[in-house]
Amino acid sequence: MLKNKSVVSIDDVQNDDLFEIFDLSESMLKTIESKGNAPLLTNKIMATLFYEPSTRTRLSFESAMHRLGGSVITVSDTKTSSAAKGETLADTVRMASSYSDIIVIRHPLEGAARLASRFTSKPIINAGDGSGQHPTQTILDLFTIKKELGSIDGKVITMVGDLRYGRTIHSLIIALSRFDVKVNLVSPEILRLPEYVYSMLPDRNYVKEYNDLEEVIGETDVLYVTRIQKERFSDQNEYQSVIGSYSINSETVEKMKKKSVIMHPLPRVDEISPDVDNMPQAAYFRQAYYGVPVRMALIYKILGD
Amino acid sequence: MEEKTLKISKIKDGTVIDHIPSGKALRVLSILGIRDDVDYTVSVGMHVPSSKMEYKDVIKIENRSLDKNELDMISLTAPNATISIIKNYEISEKFKVELPPKLIGIIKCKNQNCITNTREPVKPEFEIVSRHPLVLRCVYCQRTMNERDVFE
């Protein structure tokens, strides 16, 4: 049960909750497309604290709350907030929780959302903490796979790009351990999935590492592409050595199954060529579109009656 | 009986740390902050034959007791160590160190990008993932640390 609970990691969302969110997301999607809004949380206020750049996640959370009839208060720029004066995150969260019913937080440091949840009794939603986790993106990713391909079980998911720092990858691979799937990991040596993430998996048998995408592209049902994140590298020479390692173009897609999808948490830089955008496998903009109904469903599960 | 085989004399008052894995005595001394400026007697036996462990290290410290943090830290490197409190040459209390289910505020997270390594008003907190070999997980950032990470 998610009622009044925080979602800091994907482990905070049990399978029952996950499937209920999927069903509710479908309803929310229909409601958006027919009526625009579902005013179910008219007396609720969401605070958004974004200490790191964000476009999709922030807009989709705020849009979701507005579509639910709630209000949103936000710090538009943390550089102009009390954080710039040296206020701790703990104090900011205490303050924000007295002004709101739920807090959505994105932060460049790992563990920030867990810390926030310790300083308030109000629910905290982790919208990404450093290279840690991004649980709501994972719920959205799983919903997208199910909606696009009919099910998650039985699928081959190939993750490519920045597996070391990619928080969407970390949350997703942990969540996929609950399903009957095969996961292929394709990345440069220095961007391999970290050992600490492996240690969170109940078993490693469903995961296999590859250097070359060609080896697995033909069996792939879901190609999950991630950006190599310049901002996570302390050594820019290391970044220069891996940028452009994998580029998905129309030739790559030709080798994929007809009924397969390409997903990307976005933003992309050059890892997916624009000539892929209009191919039927390109699901990344639809994936972003589902962000609002999925977050509406999650917020309603936490704050609704 | 075993005591007779030790090449370290008995102490009148203080603490004996026994059954330290062979070669770990220096790490235990470091945990206890014992350096060259101590003003009490410390006896260290390294690579001592042992019926239980084949070889072990033993430390005897005169006129000093250990606090909970020190015992928790010792348990990380010597999980089967036994502690004897000595009073007037007799053992007044004897117990095994115990690895607590959570370690709070006694070690730092090795992840420089962990929120606990900032000014925030929280103590670093770790769960035990595995005792042999030692693996700890930061409750905040989820990174794991092994024995070497803890004591480097």
From Swiss-Prot, chain A:
Catalysis: reaction(s): carbamoyl phosphate + L-aspartate = N-carbamoyl-L-aspartate + phosphate + H(+)
Keywords attached to this entry: Pyrimidine biosynthesis, Transferase
Keyword Transferase on entry: yes
Binding-site positions, carbamoyl phosphate: 56-57, 106, 134, 137, 266-267
Gene Ontology molecular-function annotations: amino acid binding; aspartate carbamoyltransferase activity
UniProt-listed Enzyme Commission number(s): 2.1.3.2
Entry binding sites for L-aspartate: 85, 167, 227
Record's keyword annotation contains Transferase: yes
Pathway annotation: Pyrimidine metabolism; UMP biosynthesis via de novo pathway; (S)-dihydroorotate from bicarbonate: step 2/3
Superkingdom, natural source: Archaea
SUPFAM superfamilies the UniProt entry points to: Aspartate/ornithine carbamoyltransferase (SSF53671)
Matching InterPro entries: Asp/Orn_carbamoyltranf_P-bd, Asp/Orn_carbamoylTrfase, Asp/Orn_carbamoylTrfase_sf, Asp_carbamoyltransf, Asp_carbamoyltransf_Asp/Orn-bd
Listed PROSITE patterns: CARBAMOYLTRANSFERASE
Biological-process GO terms, alphabetical: 'de novo' pyrimidine nucleobase biosynthetic process; 'de novo' UMP biosynthetic process; amino acid metabolic process
Purpose: Catalyzes the condensation of carbamoyl phosphate and aspartate to form carbamoyl aspartate and inorganic phosphate, the committed step in the de novo pyrimidine nucleotide biosynthesis pathway.
Family: Belongs to the aspartate/ornithine carbamoyltransferase superfamily. ATCase family.
Record note on quaternary structure: Heterooligomer of catalytic and regulatory chains.
Record's protein name: Aspartate carbamoyltransferase catalytic subunit
Curated annotation (Swiss-Prot), chain B:
Binding note for cofactor: Binds 1 zinc ion per subunit.
UniProt keyword Ubl conjugation present: no
Cofactor: Zn(2+)
Biological process annotations from GO: 'de novo' pyrimidine nucleobase biosynthetic process; pyrimidine nucleotide biosynthetic process
A Pfam family per the record: PyrI
The entry's keywords: Metal-binding, Pyrimidine biosynthesis, Zinc
Gene3D superfamilies reported in the protein's UniProt record: Aspartate carbamoyltransferase regulatory subunit, C-terminal domain, Aspartate carbamoyltransferase regulatory subunit, N-terminal domain
UniProt: Zn(2+) binding residues: 109, 114, 138, 141
GO molecular function annotation: metal ion binding
Entry GO terms, CC: aspartate carbamoyltransferase complex
NCBIfam families in the record: ATCase_reg (TIGR00240)
Similarity-based family: Belongs to the PyrI family.
Subunit structure: Contains catalytic and regulatory chains.
Annotated function: Involved in allosteric regulation of aspartate carbamoyltransferase.
Protein's UniProt name: Aspartate carbamoyltransferase regulatory chain
Organism name: Thermoplasma volcanium (strain ATCC 51530 / DSM 4299 / JCM 9571 / NBRC 15438 / GSS1)
Taxonomic lineage from the root: Archaea, Methanobacteriati, Thermoplasmatota, Thermoplasmata, Thermoplasmatales
Gene: pyrI
